[in-house]
Each structure stands twice: as structure tokens, then as C-alpha cells.
């Protein structure tokens, strides 16, 4: 009986280690849900300065969030977020203006995975 209990405990420990990279949403962050092939919300307004995004991948493939200015320069990009995972993406300083957000994965932006970031 002890041996069976030990086996069950080992199995539980192994399954617990299989969890995703999900984290809790920080206070004051902007939640963005990513799916194929869109951001929700796709039109985001935040104050200038430090901006914290809470990215949740509800899709079936990896996604990220990149920020591009009006001159087509990439300002920042999050890490890749696996399906079912969430991450905190911090941009230390962003000036007031209008930016494009998009997914850098091949074909995602062209499929509509983009939006607008307005910084006030």
C-alpha cells in the first residue's frame, strides 16, 4: 500500500510540473488576449512612460506582441507566449503617440493580428 501511495505522489508531482508559464495579472497592467489571428482589445490606450501588458495566449499557436512606430521601427517585442500561457511584458518608456501592435510570427500580421496603441 505504501508503494502504491508513493507512486501516486510521484505522478502528481510530475503532472504539477507540466503546467504552463501562466502568471497572475499585475495591478495596473493592460490585459491583452491573443488568439488566431487577433488581439483583444485591438485598440489600446495607455498613459506615456512605463507600460505593463499582461499577455494571455488563448490561441493554439505561439504569439507575441511587438510595438512599431509610424516610421516602421520596432520599439519593443515581448517574448513568445505558448498556447495557454500568459506573461508580463513591460515597456520601460514609451512616448505619447500612435503605434502599431502586431504579432511577429510569420503570416500573423498579414492575417489580421495587429492593432493600434495610443499613448497619451
Identify the meaning behind each predicted range.
Residues 64-68:
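Beta-strand signatures of extracellular beta-sandwich domains
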Residues 25-48:
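N-terminal edge beta-strand
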Residues 36, 45, 57-59, 69-71, ...:
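A mature extracytoplasmic/lumenal domain signature
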Residues 72-78:
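Surface-exposed loop/edge segments in extracytoplasmic proteins
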Amino acid at each position: 500500500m505504501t508503494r502504491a501511495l508513493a507512486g501516486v505522489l510521484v505522478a502528481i508531482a510530475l503532472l504539477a510540473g507540466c503546467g504552463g508559464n501562466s502568471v497572475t495579472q499585475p495591478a495596473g497592467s493592460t490585459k491583452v488576449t491573443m488568439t488566431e489571428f487577433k488581439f483583444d482589445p485591438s485598440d489600446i490606450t495607455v498613459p506615456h512612460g512605463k507600460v505593463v501588458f499582461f499577455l494571455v495566449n488563448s490561441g493554439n499557436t505561439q504569439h507575441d506582441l511587438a510595438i512599431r512606430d509610424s516610421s516602421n521601427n520596432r520599439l519593443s517585442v515581448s517574448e513568445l507566449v505558448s498556447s495557454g500561457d500568459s506573461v508580463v511584458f513591460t515597456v520601460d518608456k514609451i512616448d505619447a503617440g500612435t503605434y502599431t501592435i502586431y504579432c511577429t510570427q510569420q503570416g500573423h500580421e498579414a492575417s489580421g493580428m495587429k492593432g493600434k496603441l495610443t499613448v497619451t
